[in-house]
């Protein structure tokens, strides 16, 4: 590596506060199987910068400045047609996407900020008539995500839908996209659920929805447990596949030791948010 390249990496590291964004990630559905999907999710997790781990779980950065805040995912459908998705590396939130020469962004301040750094060469920019909030997306789609099948075939359909603008259809497609990428990166269980749906679609399990609604709460309690002998200050109630409520009270739970893969930094969690937030993707602002 040349001294110029080394210097460039050092400058980037300083700019990002000591952490380097590792680059874009890609996933092709043509020929995809559970293994290749698992590698994609692993690549997505590895591309998210962090400085420390809490109970061996990567803690996402509280903030990143400029273009380094955004990771690009290149997703190809079965026909090889592609969209590029912009992801905020501090929370794994999807900000918008590029289809052909048109960029699309959620109608919210965070996405508007992202539009200043990604897809700048797009010939046309469209602001979607909704935010990335789960509740808003479900209203726009006309159905809750509990009734929208997910799987790799559904991801193919979502990509194909997003290639052409239809705000109602796009809302449902984005619900599929969020769960098969961002949520799968956050939780090993959700990744495995999608792997089981590599060749067929099925609605999300009750446990999947419960985990999606509880990521911020779990993240918060796991971080607080560091100063409380591993005990959660506020228990998190999850729902299993059979609809049974399960109380998580400490870091020895399997949800902590082998399921959750990324932690949202407490500096990005709304005060009073202890989980069970059914209307959001992660927490209250998305």
UniProtKB/Swiss-Prot annotation:
Active-site positions on this chain: 183
Alphabetical keyword list: Glycoprotein, Hydrolase, Plant defense, Protein synthesis inhibitor, Signal, Toxin
Biological processes, Gene Ontology terms: defense response; negative regulation of translation
Residues making up the propeptide: 270-286
Signal sequence annotation: 1-23
Top-rank EC class of the record's enzyme: hydrolase
Family (UniProt): Belongs to the ribosome-inactivating protein family. Type 1 RIP subfamily.
Name listed for the protein in its UniProt record: Ribosome-inactivating protein momordin I
